[in-house]
Amino acid sequence: DGCEGWKTGCQKCPTLNNYPPVKIDRAHQLVAGKRQLFREMLALGCQFISPSQHVADAFNSLYGPGRCRIINNGIDMATEAILADLPPVRETQGKPKIAVVAHDLRYDGKTNQQLVREMMALGDKIELHTFGKFSPFTAGNVVNHGFETDKRKLMSALNQMDALVFSSRVDNYPLILCE
């Protein structure tokens, strides 16, 4: 919204009517305490994450370069509509179903091969489901679904999972589809 009041302690908020509207402006009373908490958390080694560049830039201007990193996020409305139409999932009976999703499952940058092999080694304690092209994973507890282009089918299958393992080291954006 272009407000720069945070730089000087949020004296008088010019955007109280922005959504959601605020009736009472207490930001100026709280900002010093919040900044102290941030400093204490940074001293403990906490890493701050922002979904947007401008928020990370503002944070880093106060607390130093690299103290806040960006993980972009978003909502895929088409996917949300599909999920809203799916029937409720019953609690898994028996072994947990774990999903691993990547465009190309062979690529270690997107899929931590060692981690997946360690999960496979759990044998009948889990059911491992892979979604993507070129799965190198085969075992009695692995179900390879392949690369699914039909979003409704993919979301229906993922909706049955108990957990998603996202082990990518090279993505700038999380798998919005699977969040």
Where on the chain are the PLM-derived regions?
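Aromatic "clamp/platform" in nucleotide-sugar-dependent glycosyltransferases that forms part
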Residues: R169
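A short hydrophobic beta-strand element within the catalytic core of glycosyltransferases
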Residues: L164-V165
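Conserved catalytic-core segment of nucleotide-activated headgroup transferases in glycan assembly
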Residues: R90-F137
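Membrane-proximal helix-turn-helix segments that form the acceptor-binding/catalytic region
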Residues: C3-F48
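Short alpha-helical segment that forms part of, or immediately flanks, the ligand-binding pocket
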Residues: M155, C178-E179
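Short alpha-helical donor nucleotide-sugar binding micro-motif in glycosyltransferases
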Residues: S156-M161
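Carbohydrate-associated surface elements
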Residues: H54, G74
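Short glycine/acidic-rich beta->alpha loop that forms part of the nucleotide-sugar donor binding site
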Residues: N172-P174
